[in-house]
Regions:
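Cell-envelope and extracellular/periplasmic
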Residues: 1-135
Length: 135
């Protein structure tokens, strides 16, 4: 049995991954430490886990929910997962559900971003139950 701590990387612009490297700040995201975590892709491929890599969540575009193709360019996720794993010894199962430029009202009604987020979370929980993964 595998155990993960599930993190829902959700929210607005600060979580949506608009990071870029430039000549002034050329350092990119770190590589994932072996065993530190995995990504569950609830939208693009909910059949398996993927190694966490930047840009995190770039393929998780739901045309009826959170949809921002080609907008995610890098995030804090890999760095956070590495640090969390180094401090706890517990790998992270990451789930992307962020939408840059959104207002809180977009997260509060029927058929909104929160509804999409809850659906993604339930999909991850079901996958874990079916694959003997403890959260």
């Amino acid at each position: 049995m595998t155990t993960y701590d599930l993190f829902l990387f959700a929210g607005q612009s600060n979580m949506a991954g608009r990071g870029i490297a430039c000549t002034q700040f050329p350092e990119g995201a770190p590589d994932l430490i072996s065993g530190a975590g995995a990504e569950f892709r609830a939208i693009s491929d909910p059949t398996r886990l993927y190694p966490i890599a930047e840009p995190f969540g770039a393929l998780e575009n739901n045309p009826t929910g959170i949809f921002e193709p080609n907008m995610k360019t890098g995030s804090l996720v890999t760095s956070f997962v590495n640090t969390y794993f180094q401090n706890t010894g517990v790998p992270v199962l990451g789930l992307s559900s962020s939408k840059g430029g959104s207002v809180i009202a977009n997260w509060q009604d029927h058929d909104d971003y929160l509804t999409d987020t809850i659906t993604r979370l339930k999909s991850a929980q079901t996958f874990c139950e079916q694959h003997n993964i403890t959260l």
